Amino acid sequence: MTNSEKIVYSIFGVTNKSTQDMAYAVDRMAELLFDQNQKLDGIKVGKAIYPVVGERAERPVGGVSRNIQRLTRVCWDAENRKNLIPFLGRDMPIRVPKELLFHLAYYSRTGIPYIKAMKHHAAPPV
């Protein structure tokens, strides 16, 4: 099991394929940020993440996109929200999937929330 799967499952539980889509998307975001050194502003989830996840999951890109968007909204349900805070470092609004993927990808690679790393000046710029 990958770090991203552990993170996603601890937030949402092991429910269905849509959680696997999110785990794949977290892996892809981490790959773009850490392995390919891309800037967050330059990453377009519709072009750089969803198609790769769709190919890996052997599912249509539109379905993958909807699943990830839905799970981003589901994060703010009371039960899931409390499970999300350890990975974000604090309670904060996440409006779009790209933000959530960034925070989860950062945690999956470093083991600490981005916000806490920034407070301690330990976070590398992304």
Tell where the protein language model's regions lie, with residue ranges.
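Basic, alpha-helical nucleic-acid-binding regions used in initiation and control of genome expression
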Residues: 3-126
